[in-house]
């Protein structure tokens, strides 16, 4: 299951009466990675918690991992990591997009301190972290690494380039992770996709971006009107249509047909459905083959991130 070389590219589920999870959602323990490379696995994504693992494996089979958001409690995070073949000993850093409770659980503090995991977040979010209950040990042990929008290195071999995005009062952070094996773009909880984000993610090999809601389901939902107004606003979340448009713009701005993989995050359980997402993205038959839909309860398979090979002039047959 974990070897993406033998798996089909990335498929959406077919609609069923029971709304079964997508085929690329798995729950069996992962096999140990031995080939050097870059891979990504979403442990779960939605309003009930968000956590994504980016894994680097060297030629000796040694692994290091970085978490993008940490929105599950200690037990669930530990279990999900184990299920994906990752232990806390592999986790070197947590990179937070923002501090909503579905993206960071302060109860993880003890595990982060025990395993000496650094927490990277924007200066705008630093005060909120400092006033979150139980997080003081992170500061006392020197594990908090605030950054201004720009570039930093969360762990050797990974360079993070950041951009601030509009979401609620303090915004959220979009990350581009660059390694010798390829680049990953990651953005969630953004009300719209500005031009700077399109440029920021141009050329990434894997794109993780939210596809939160179906607009019609949202306007017809029983949620309070102020919640719907917030989600639909430029400071809320991306709809399926907005996500599709953002992906197409990033593809247009990218060379060599990138991104090779598109991972859709943070699908609303009340105001979205896999079939709604699929109907939007199947407009492009080539794009839908590259798409993985995430799930709140179950992780995705490991997605191996490999840059698309550049076509050399010697390989081209020029029309005369």
Regions found by a protein language model. Give the residues of each.
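Metallo-beta-lactamase
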Residues: 21-24, 123-181
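Metal-dependent catalytic neighborhoods of phosphoester/phosphodiester hydrolases
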Residues: 105-115, 130-133, 272-279
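Cap/insert and terminal regions of metallo-dependent hydrolase folds
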Residues: 195-295
């Amino acid at each position: 299951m974990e070897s993406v070389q033998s798996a089909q590219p990335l498929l959406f589920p077919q609609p069923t009466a029971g709304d079964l999870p997508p085929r690329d959602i798995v729950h069996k323990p992962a096999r140990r990675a031995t080939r050097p490379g870059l891979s990504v696995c979403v442990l779960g994504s939605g309003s009930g918690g968000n956590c994504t693992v980016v894994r680097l494996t060297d030629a000796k089979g040694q692994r290091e991992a970085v978490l993008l958001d940490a929105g599950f409690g200690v037990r669930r995070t530990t279990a999900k990591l184990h299920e994906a073949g990752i232990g806390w000993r592999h986790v070197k850093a947590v990179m937070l997009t923002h501090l909503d409770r579905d993206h960071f659980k302060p109860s993880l503090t003890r595990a982060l301190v025990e395993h000496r995991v650094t927490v990277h977040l924007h200066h705008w979010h630093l005060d909120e972290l400092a006033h979150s209950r139980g997080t003081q040990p992170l500061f006392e042990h020197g594990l908090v690494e605030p950054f201004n929008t720009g570039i930093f290195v969360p762990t050797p071999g990974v360079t993070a380039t950041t951009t601030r995005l509009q979401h609620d009062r303090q915004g959220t952070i979009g990350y581009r992770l660059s390694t010798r094996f390829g680049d990953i773009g990651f953005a969630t909880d953004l009300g719209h996709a500005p031009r700077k984000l399109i440029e920021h993610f141009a050329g990434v090999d894997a794109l993780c971006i939210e596809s939160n809601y179906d607009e019609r389901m949202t306007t017809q939902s029983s949620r309070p009107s102020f919640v719907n107004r917030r989600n639909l606003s430029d400071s809320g979340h991306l709809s399926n249509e907005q996500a599709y448009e953002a992906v197409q713009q990033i593809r247009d701005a990218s060379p060599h047909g990138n991104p090779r993989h598109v991972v859709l995050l943070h699908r609303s359980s009340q105001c979205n459905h896999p079939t709604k997402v699929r109907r939007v993205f199947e407009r492009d038959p080539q794009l839908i083959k590259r798409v993985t839909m995430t799930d709140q309860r179950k992780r995705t398979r490991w997605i191996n991130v490999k840059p698309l090979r550049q076509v050399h002039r010697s390989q081209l047959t020029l029309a005369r």
